[in-house]
Amino acid sequence: MSNVNMWEIENGVYGEGFEIICGVDEAGRGPLAGPVCAAAVILPKGLEIPGLTDSKKLTDKKRRELFPVIKDQAIAYGIGLASHNEIDEINILHATYLAMERALAQLTVKPDIALIDGNRAKDFGLPVRTVVRGDSLSMNIAAASILAKVTRDDLMLELAEKYPQYGFEVHKGYGTKAHYEALRVHGASEIHRKTFLKKFYGEK
């Protein structure tokens, strides 16, 4: 499948005079446990990566096939995390921005502009444009969505070995029925987001 339509947003931005475009996306805003992960990716203009689209539309197998391809073909990429503690301290929105800042700081090439998935962003020290459903519409954001998702999934698989009673290897920390049942039986672990569990525990 051609990626031609996935370059439309970037092509418009190139037409405005920007030369180096970075895509930014996150994974893990919603889970009850673990970090939020962000990735920033700069792809060569017009690059074709067959099958590349929003990570949520892909199987885990396909994401893992694309992961090394994106890293290999990118001009630059960066990955940043914000921990469960940081999420509890500054809230999930600001923790997401922190993870994005850390991902952008990892780039070895400075972008002229960042395209960020969603409808809100902060000033990251460079021009920023938000793109609603950007992970389905922009090559750079789609690539970032895959790097963020696979990186976070792998971290949750590691945490599943340390905390086997919660089933992180299955739900990656999201609030599934099985996860809530494990919380009822075992209580929260040290890597759970306490602010996300207040309602569950009836706290205010």
Where does each model-flagged region fall?
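RNase H-like, Mg2+-dependent phosphodiesterase core
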Residues: 1-204
